[in-house]
Structure formats: structure tokens, C-alpha cells
From Swiss-Prot:
Subcellular locations according to the entry: Cell inner membrane
The protein's name: Zinc import ATP-binding protein ZnuC
Positions annotated to bind ATP: 45-52
Annotated source species: Rhizobium meliloti (strain 1021) (Ensifer meliloti)
Known role: Part of the ABC transporter complex ZnuABC involved in zinc import. Responsible for energy coupling to the transport system.
Record carries keyword RNA-binding: no
Length: 302
């Protein structure tokens, strides 16, 4: 059996204090993480927090304005975009979708469609696919060239709960079979893929990081959603030592206010990845915490 998480494995991508600046404003700053073969890293955060910018910086689409990024020589990246502009008035089959980014052999198309459960839909028109089927088709296209790193930008958007579980199970199967690293982007601040090794919470900088708390620990969640969900989904709890104010400034635990927040300012010290975090009910991410209990309701502090 492959040991995907061997400490000797050289990272596919590593970011060190990386930041991107546009029009005099930092889109994201002070980002540190790495991804090795077989490892899953999930970036979470509200809209505009720098998740996609960070991912594009990691794979070389954007260059950092500070810090640095190292990538394995000859790194092959498979990418599933958050949105794909398709003219639905034009005929486009799943098979044709596979080759929009470059030519593929018939065998490569068949193998990747079969791996994502879409081989029987090869001749289907893309506009007739469900949300889950379309995401599977995009996954098939991304893995067809056997990438070292798979980047998935909001892969479960527009998919219902059961479809979300099925997609996470599929992503796990792809990782286990190929050994590729996975960088997953999600706007959901609390529910992440259970197989995630490291969760990085962004809001212009790294607010916190850690490992997900597996939902199978909660009998109430099991009762509500079943064991299949517990195997695919996990809960990530946050611990932030600061709050993002409406004007973009940052209020720190010591009462001071700064224009931004990143490790170099002397305030922010995010937790190590192996810590379990508690979530402040209004941590500044732009969302209230979904407090643990899993009774089917979302609990909010008054």
C-alpha cells in the first residue's frame, strides 16, 4: 500500500509568507502551507477572503508580491474551476467538454469518465446534466492528464446534500487511487471533507488553521444524517484571536486596531495544525458559528 504521508515526501507546492497585492491593496498576505502527494488541504473563508487568489498563486497563475512559492519541477496540475462559462445554446457533449483544454486520446477520455462514473454520459449534452453530473464531468477532465496536484474550486457548489457526500467520496477515491495532492476551496466555514489533512481559514490572511473534527464523534449527527455522511463530512471549529471590522481594519485581543493582520504585525499567531479549536460566535469571518450539537438546527449566540 502506498504511504502517501511519508515524512520523506517532497512537497508538491509550498507557500512561505506569500502575499498578493493589486491596486495598492493586499488581496491576501502572510500565507504559509504546503501540499504533498496524497495530502488534502482545504482553504475556507467568506467571499473575497483570498481563497482563489491563494490557489492561483500556489499553482503559478499569479506571482506573489511578497514571500515565495516553491513548486516541484515539472508539476502537473488538474484544475476544476469555480465557474465555467459555457454557451448553453451551442451543442456540447461531455466527450467534447473533455477536450476543450487540449487533445486527449480516446482511451484517456474513457478511463477518466469511467473513474468518475460518467462513461455512460459521454454522448450527453452538457446543458442536460444535473449539478452533480456536471461536477463529475469537470473532475473527469481534470484527472484525464494524470495530474500531481488537483485543485478543486468549490467542487460541491450547486449540489444537494447527498450529491455533496458522493462527490467527496469520489475525490477520496481519486486521491487513494492516484496518490495526487489535493487543494480544495470551500466557502463553507464549518463543514469540510472528512479526509482533509489541514484546514486553512483565510480572510485576507491566515485567520487560523487546524484539523477537522470528524462528525462521527457526534451520535446526534449520525442519527440525523447517517454513517455515510460521517465518513465524508467533518466539522472544523475555529479559534481566531482577532475580529475583522466592517471597514476592513482588524481588532486584536489586546484591544489594538491595525489596518491588516498577518504574522509580521506582531499580533497574529495562528494555531498549529494538530490543535482542536473553539469558534467564537462572531469571529470576524462574516459568519456566525454553527455551535456543536448537530440537532438539525443552527444555534446562534444572542
Amino acid at each position: 500500500m502506498l504511504n502517501f504521508r511519508s515524512p520523506e515526501t517532497m512537497p508538491l507546492v509550498s507557500l512561505a509568507n506569500a502575499g498578493v497585492r493589486r491596486n495598492g491593496r493586499w488581496l491576501v498576505r502572510g500565507v504559509d502551507f504546503s501540499i504533498s502527494r496524497g495530502e488534502i488541504v482545504t482553504l475556507i473563508g467568506p467571499n473575497g477572503s483570498g481563497k482563489s487568489t491563494t490557489a492561483k498563486t500556489a499553482i503559478g497563475v499569479l506571482k506573489p508580491d511578497e514571500g515565495h512559492v516553491e513548486r516541484l519541477a515539472g508539476l502537473k496540475v488538474g484544475y476544476v474551476p469555480q465557474k465555467l462559462a459555457v454557451d448553453w445554446t451551442l451543442p456540447l457533449t461531455v466527450e467534447r467538454l473533455m477536450t476543450l483544454t487540449g487533445p486527449l486520446k480516446g482511451r484517456e477520455i474513457e478511463e477518466s469518465l469511467a473513474a468518475t462514473g460518467m462513461l455512460h454520459m459521454a454522448k450527453a449534452e452538457v446543458q442536460h446534466l444535473s449539478g452533480g453530473e456536471f461536477q463529475r464531468a469537470l473532475l473527469a477532465r481534470a484527472i484525464a492528464r494524470k495530474p500531481d496536484l488537483l485543485v478543486l474550486d468549490e467542487p460541491v457548489q450547486g449540489v444537494d446534500f447527498s450529491g455533496e457526500i458522493a462527490l467527496y467520496e469520489l475525490i477520496k477515491q481519486i486521491r487513494n487511487r492516484t496518490g495526487c495532492g489535493i487543494l480544495l476551496i470551500s466557502h463553507d466555514l464549518h463543514i469540510v471533507m472528512a479526509e482533509t489533512d489541514t484546514v486553512v481559514c483565510l480572510n485576507g490572511h491566515v485567520c487560523c488553521r487546524g484539523t477537522p473534527q470528524v462528525v462521527s464523534q457526534s451520535p446526534e449527527y449520525l442519527k440525523l444524517f447517517g454513517r455515510r455522511a460521517a465518513g465524508a463530512l467533518a466539522v472544523y471549529s475555529h479559534h481566531h484571536d482577532h475580529t475583522h471590522l466592517p471597514d476592513g481594519r482588524v481588532l486584536h485581543a489586546d484591544g489594538s486596531i491595525t489596518e491588516s493582520c498577518f504574522p509580521g504585525d506582531g499580533h497574529h499567531h495562528h494555531e498549529e495544525a494538530d490543535n482542536i479549536h473553539d469558534h467564537d460566535p462572531d469571529c470576524g469571518c462574516g459568519h456566525h458559528a454553527r455551535l456543536q450539537g448537530y440537532d438539525g438546527t443552527e444555534k446562534r449566540d444572542a
